Amino acid sequence: MLLTISDFLFLSLTFSRYARMRDSRPWSDRKNNYSGPQFTYPPEKAPPEKLIKWNNEGSPIFEMPAEGGHIEP
């Protein structure tokens, strides 16, 4: 059976020899991967640089702070 270039590209893109490898570590070693906290704290929010107000037509109006300061939300 002859493989064309398109067949070779299809096979190389759809099947990976690393996709379904068995984990050879014992269960006690694998279990240690999932111990401990499973979350991180959220990052601090950046302060807003402009204030957005909406007019009666539904269009936004952007107001910039004076002297490069930050606007409190």
From Swiss-Prot:
GO BP terms in the entry: defense response to bacterium; defense response to fungus; killing of cells of another organism
Positions of disulphide bridges: none
Repeat as UniProt keyword: no
Localization: Secreted
Keywords, comma-separated and alphabetical: Antibiotic, Antimicrobial, Cytolysis, Fungicide, Hemolysis, Secreted, Signal
Extent of the signal sequence: 1-14
Keyword set includes Signal: yes
GO cellular component assignments: extracellular region
Sequence segments annotated as region (Disordered): 25-48
Principal location class: secreted
Summary of the function given for this chain in its UniProt record: Displays antimicrobial activity against the Gram-positive bacterium S.aureus ATCC 2592, the Gram-negative bacteria E.coli ATCC 25922 and P.aeruginosa ATCC 27853, and the fungus C.albicans ATCC 2002. Displays stronger activity against P.aeruginosa and S.aureus than E.coli. Displays very weak hemolytic activity.
Protein name, as recorded: Antimicrobial peptide lumbricin-PG
